[in-house]
Amino acid sequence: MISIREMTAADEGAVMEMVDRFYHSPAVEHEVDPAVLRRSFQAAVDPAEPLIQGLVLEEDGRPVGYHYMCIGYSAEVGGRYLLLDELYLDPECRGKGYGERVIRWAMEQHPECLRYRLEVTEGNRAARLYERMGFRYLDYKQMVIDR
């Protein structure tokens, strides 16, 4: 069974190894500077940073995944939304219902949110889970400028 707990600075080694695996998987379509990924980890464990929360997912006391949740406001929904960002599980832990449990837990922790949002790449097998849970596609293409 999976357990969910807040990420701490002591998790840096284990989490950053999983972050590296996530960013070198088909779930990500572009390269991200490792310094940016480390900065995101630091923000996720900083209690003074209200916009991101990091979770460590454990099976039998061993880290097997991580998840970042990010809060935002959307004019389109007239309220807050929760970005379910970077949900990663080790391959041997997939297909056990852990992803659904983590997503439901995150949604229960943030009932104030009017939308729960996530991103998937084309062909991501996890999309079937998300659709089963009630997520639907919005036909937007993202455009960004990074600074």
Model region roles, listed by residue range:
Residues S3-V15:
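A short beta-loop-alpha structural element at the N-terminal edge
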Residues A43-V56:
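A short helix-loop-beta-strand connector motif used in the catalytic cores of GNAT acetyltransferases and
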Residues Y73-L84, R94, L138:
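A conserved beta-turn-beta hairpin within the catalytic core of GNAT-like acetyltransferases
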Residues E100, E122-D139:
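Conserved active-site alpha-helix within GNAT-family acetyltransferase domains
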Residues Q109-T121:
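Conserved GNAT acetyl-CoA-binding A-motif
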